[in-house]
Every structure is written in structure tokens, then in C-alpha cells.
């Protein structure tokens, strides 16, 4: 083989080395970009974790509050049922008392009128009895008013129960939003891990290429051939060139 051919091989080797260096620089830039992206994602992940932990803590508090509200709601429901039953019983009793009172009053007034008519008593006795009957009626009316106030209190408790139902719905919506946010973060982490593993594998492949590249192996065989044919000067020049190229590639790989 002539010296021109050897120089062409050397130029070709330099071109290939330049191409490999360019490819290594591209891989290095891509790895650096992915590392920056991974660091950014890690920072965002830490922030998201802090936010998530805060929201989880709040959610746990809301869950406890929800359980307490549910228990309170159940107690109020039981109390409501008891009060409704008591209200029905008191309403029935009140109606019976009013009816009995009206009957007793009518009977009493009839007896008083008959007694006064028979014995000619003064009107003062009649007035006294009427005042007593009036006082009894006022007492019963006050009891009826107390029952009505109790019924109004039950209505307010029913409104409070509706408010608790609205709070329960709001808590469930917040829980669903937190679960969706957590899923998005996990997907981004998985994507960053896959990209990093792929670039690491490509880096290893590029760093091992000089030992497995077919062109480099062919040049080594030609050098051995020239050595055997006593072309010592050419052999030494090519050997130094190849060692120089391998050293540059090794340095590039070491920097990576």
C-alpha cells in the first residue's frame, strides 16, 4: 500500500475520530440537559412532596373531622327521631289535655252556675272561679308555646345537618383532586428515570466503541501487516496516530 493510501487512511481515521468526538459531545450535551431536567424535576418533586404532605395532613385532619361530624350527625339523627317521637306524644297529650280541660271547664262552670242559682251566692265567687280557670288556661298555653319553640329548635338542627352534608361533599372533591395530582407526579418521575437510563446506556456504548469499532480493528491489522513487512517508519507513524486518537477518545470518555 502506498503512502498516499496510508495518509488517506489517516485522514479517514481523523474524520471518524472527529465524528465520534462530535457524537460524544452531542451525547454529553443531551446527558447534561437530561441531568438538568432531572434536577429540575427533583426540585419540583420535593416541592410537590412538601405540598402533598401538607395536603395529606390536612386531608387526614379533614377525615377525622368528617368522622366526628358523621358521628355527631348520627347522634343528632337519633336525637331528632327521639324528639319527633316525643313531640308527637306531647302533641297528643296536649290535645287530650286541652279537650279534657275544655270539658272540665264547661262542666265546672255549669256546676258553679247551678250552685249559685240554687244557693243565691254573690258574683264574687263566680269571678274567683273564672280567674282560677283563666290562670290554668294561661299555664297550658305557656306549655303549648314551649312545645312550639322545641319544634323550631328541631328545624334549626335539620338545617345544620344539611350544612354538614355540603361540607362532606367538598371534602370528597378535594380528596379526588389530591389523588389526580399524585398520579401526575408519579408519571413524570417514571419518565425522567427511563430517559436517564437510556442516556447512560448510550454513553457506555459510545465509550466502548473504539475497542469494538470495525474500522479501528482494521487499521490495527494493517499496522501489524506493515510491521511484518518491515515498514517501520510507516508503522510507527500510524501507531502513534492511532494511540493519539485513542487517547483523545479516552480523555473525552473520562470527562463524561
UniProtKB/Swiss-Prot annotation:
Residues 10-255 form a coiled coil. Signal peptide: none annotated. GO terms for cellular component: cytoplasm; sperm midpiece. Keywords: Coiled coil, Cytoplasm. It is found in: Cytoplasm. InterPro entries: CCDC172. Its main location: cytoplasm. The keyword Coiled coil applies. Belongs to the CCDC172 family. PANTHER family: COILED-COIL DOMAIN-CONTAINING PROTEIN 172. This is Coiled-coil domain-containing protein 172. The lineage of its organism: Eukaryota, Metazoa, Chordata, Craniata, Vertebrata.
